[in-house]
């Protein structure tokens, strides 16, 4: 990673004082995840070495943020909010539908995520995606989709399967 992304890494490190390299952990992890598909143990050690922190500190960051993964995930990551406002507006039934549509086990989805047999999608149930007034909602990769119906979910999945989805803003 250091050799391939040396320019990007130097640019990131230049944003922080020399004695505060640990501040670069998040952007360095983003590079690692882009390169390997998830934050591998080797990538975590490499980020730790660059940021001059212990690997356990970097691993804790990976474990804290829902957009960093410590295990292989599908091409697209689908995160369904399960927090109280979304639950009150049907996220549990929505998650049932999503599991059925993608053919994954709900228990796995609720305990770390489940990936489809073809490797296209990983479905996760997560706590709060910060759009409580627009429930039920989900995030696919980095894009939010709000006030979704099961039919709209099915359409989105088909668009992502066929690469016909173009990013759009949901209001």
Predicted regions and their residues:
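Signature of N-terminal electron-transfer/Fe-S-associated modules in redox systems
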Residues: 1-171
